[in-house]
């Protein structure tokens, strides 16, 4: 059976032998019909190349190769990729409308090109790009094996780009308001609670200096790991990708520590509620992405509607929705008493450099002979 119908190492039994490609002796003598889309628009798992088969998804596959026009038309047909597209295309439109209101229709005295909004531009570009690339990858994944790999490499890169853009927004809009990163608060706090006579000024300065460079390195490393997970050495690609994309979330640890050490719920209830609700949605999304429930329980029943990747999309959308909410609130507080304006090199410059690095990573993997398609 194809290696993609079950997760390697998971010990999951596949379909019975009667469904195998080699169990159709009658089909050998029967005349073959031309592979026209009108003859058989949707295929089963044993009628497509192994590299296109998804875990526990038995039907709903588009014929291969498709043309670009056929790929676009398939978003209105009941395939196993249709809702993968719509569960991110609708959020893309919602967030596009949201950011247009923030930048152009917010009624603020700050123009859209003001340096104070540069971190928001970085964050917005990451959110919109990750949804756009996800839609593109799911729609055009059946053009060819190489293009499928290329689109999903770009999908992984866009997620890393979004993660770094989130860190830029946190760095300028959220972290400065935390007591945890205020030496005037932390120095007496450490002395009172731990009895340590430590001046936290230097430690906090070092942390601030390292946040963006470390997040940058993590973004590149996560993309490399996810691209590598599409090769045959990786037994659990979904678990690996989930883990590596959890790593950049560590950049938000100061907010979590703030809620433990200080009264974040009382001082900033919006941040507290939406921050923890976001991480709840992320945990739920990770559960579905790794477990492959519900299609693992009943293969074939959720091929078109309700399989785990669609649920993963929905819960990641909810997590980003909560994040946008508290980033917007952080922006409002930032504009009330802004410190020094963010620089172009410290915001957009970082993002452009990241684009170059991620492009080089994708180019390296596409030029290698060892690539394989695993969503």
UniProtKB/Swiss-Prot annotation:
Residues 1-39 are annotated as: Disordered. Keywords: Cell membrane, Lipid-binding, Membrane, Receptor, Steroid-binding, Transmembrane, Transmembrane helix. It comes from the Eukaryota. Residues 1-84, 136-160, 225-241, 321-341 are cytoplasmic. Its main location: membrane. It is a multi-pass membrane protein. Residues 106-114, 182-203, 263-299, 363-375 are extracellular. Residues 15-39 have a biased composition (Low complexity). The chain crosses the membrane at residues 85-105, 115-135, 161-181, 204-224, 242-262, 300-320, 342-362. InterPro entries: AdipoR/HlyIII-related. One of its GO terms (molecular function) is steroid binding. It is found in: Cell membrane. One of its GO terms (cellular component) is plasma membrane. Plasma membrane progesterone (P4) receptor coupled to G proteins. Seems to act through a G(s) mediated pathway. May be involved in regulating rapid P4 signaling in the nervous system. Also binds dehydroepiandrosterone (DHEA), pregnanolone, pregnenolone and allopregnanolone. Homodimer. Non-classical progesterone receptors involved in extranuclear signaling are classified in 2 groups: the class II progestin and adipoQ receptor (PAQR) family (also called mPRs) (PAQR5, PAQR6, PAQR7, PAQR8 and PAQR9) and the b5-like heme/steroid-binding protein family (also called MAPRs) (PGRMC1, PGRMC2, NENF and CYB5D2). Belongs to the ADIPOR family. This is Membrane progesterone receptor epsilon. It comes from Mus musculus (Mouse). The lineage of its organism: Eukaryota, Metazoa, Chordata, Craniata, Vertebrata. The gene is Paqr9.
